[in-house]
């Protein structure tokens, strides 16, 4: 990993803790209906299927105007590479512009072009779907989560037309004035990297040969192959965090691309293996959490390293934020969920 000094770059993202809503027939849920508009342009209609109004964060979800991952695209069994950004959110102090409210039975609509964040120039049939959890917000604080799931949509892509769609990241250029890693930001990040390496190594050892029930709590299985995979990814994170002059990622101390909105702690560009910290990464997160499953700089950095395929392939997704959402995932989804690794590392460190 290359860290921003006067000539190098540096980047990271943060972990969001949530608590689950009460289970039952009135539990909130979102139904997502995907339809094709024209070639690679898709419409999503998100419906509140619960009996009460819900307010949720729409960043990293439908209605987010940024090039975020709203759907997964598959050719056969293989997922098409996502070429956008993954943003990490703070868990409190969330401002109104990041929140959407839907009454019972109400819907929101979002249109987007899947070719803007994936290479579909080869054309042919692809299948599109989306699932996960979106954070519930009450008085600016994440207090729970809402599960969402879409239909499977099959689209026969015209490759020629898809190739002409402007790529979201091709428009990204670094700002002329970039604050390199120096001063307090450099000091904070250096500490975060050291702590992330320590936590990742501890968690890797625990994953491979530690308490089975603790591993199952976060990854929903005690299968030895899964334990080995988790340990390998965590060791790869530790190795990357321990390198500030080489490695596979570029880590920005600041926001070179302009995606640090008021509620974003950091963001990742997986296709470029870049991570960027936002101002509130430094101002709102402690170096290490003193409470189980709380946000901090170290596990935020660890979380973001798992997103980068250059660290360990494939990079993880954001399928469930925080302990309660992450521990509701299936074993397969937990293995591919960034926060599952961050939460597990925190739990091993604090003996949760």
From Swiss-Prot:
E.C. code: 3.4.24.39
Catalytic residue positions: 304
Pro-piece positions: 20-175
Residue positions binding Zn(2+): 303, 307, 318
Annotated GO MF terms: metal ion binding; metalloendopeptidase activity
Alphabetical list of CDD domains matching this protein: M35_deuterolysin_like
Influence of temperature on activity: Thermostable.
Gene Ontology biological-process entries: proteolysis
Note describing how the cofactor binds: Binds 1 zinc ion per subunit.
InterPro entries the record matches: Fungal_M35_metalloproteases, MetalloPept_cat_dom_sf, Peptidase_M35
Keywords on record: Cleavage on pair of basic residues, Disulfide bond, Hydrolase, Metal-binding, Metalloprotease, Protease, Signal, Zinc, Zymogen
One CC-aspect GO term: extracellular region
Residues making up the signal peptide according to the UniProt record: 1-19
Cofactor(s) the protein needs: Zn(2+)
Coiled-coil ranges (or none): none
Pfam families: Peptidase_M35
Disulphide bridges: 181-253, 260-278, 292-352
Catalysed reactions, as listed in the record: Preferential cleavage of bonds with hydrophobic residues in P1'. Also 3-Asn-|-Gln-4 and 8-Gly-|-Ser-9 bonds in insulin B chain
Enzyme class: hydrolase
Family: Belongs to the peptidase M35 family.
Free-text function comment from the UniProt entry: Metalloprotease that shows high activities on basic nuclear substrates such as histone and protamine.
Protein name: Neutral protease 2
Species name: Aspergillus oryzae (strain ATCC 42149 / RIB 40)
């Amino acid at each position: 990993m290359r860290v921003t000094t006067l000539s190098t770059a540096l980047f990271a993202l943060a972990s969001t803790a949530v608590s689950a809503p009460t289970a039952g027939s009135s539990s909130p849920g979102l139904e997502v209906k995907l339809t094709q508009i024209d070639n690679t342009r898709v419409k999503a209609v998100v419906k509140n299927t619960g009996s009460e109004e819900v307010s949720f964060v729409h960043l990293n979800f439908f209605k987010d105007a940024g090039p975020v991952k709203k759907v997964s695209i598959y050719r056969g069994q293989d997922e098409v590479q996502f070429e956008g950004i993954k943003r990490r959110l703070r868990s409190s102090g969330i401002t109104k512009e990041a929140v959407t409210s839907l009454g019972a039975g109400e819907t929101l609509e979002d249109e987007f072009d899947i070719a803007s964040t994936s290479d579909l120039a080869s054309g042919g049939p692809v299948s599109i779907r989306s699932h996960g959890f979106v954070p519930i917000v009450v008085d600016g604080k994440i207090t729970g989560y809402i599960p969402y799931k879409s239909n499977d949509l099959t689209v026969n892509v015209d490759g020629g037309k898809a190739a002409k769609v402007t790529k979201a990241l091709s428009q990204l250029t670094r700002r002329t004035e970039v604050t390199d890693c120096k001063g307090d930001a450099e000091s904070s990040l250096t500490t975060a990297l050291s702590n992330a390496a320590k936590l990742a190594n501890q968690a890797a050892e625990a994953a491979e040969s530690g308490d089975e029930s603790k591993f199952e709590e976060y990854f929903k299985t005690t299968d030895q192959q899964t334990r080995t995979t988790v340990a390998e990814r965590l060791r790869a994170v530790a190795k990357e965090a321990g390198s500030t002059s080489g490695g596979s990622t570029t880590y920005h101390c600041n926001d070179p691309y302009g995606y640090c909105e008021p509620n974003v702690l950091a963001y990742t560009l997986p296709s470029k293996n870049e991570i960027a910290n936002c101002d509130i990464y430094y101002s709102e997160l402690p170096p290490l959490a003193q409470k189980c499953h709380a946000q901090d700089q170290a596990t935020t950095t660890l979380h973001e390293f798992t997103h980068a395929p250059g660290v360990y392939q494939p990079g993880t997704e954001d399928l469930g934020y925080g302990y309660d959402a992450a521990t509701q995932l299936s074993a397969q989804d937990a293995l591919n969920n960034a926060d599952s690794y961050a939460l597990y590392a925190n739990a091993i460190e604090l003996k949760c």
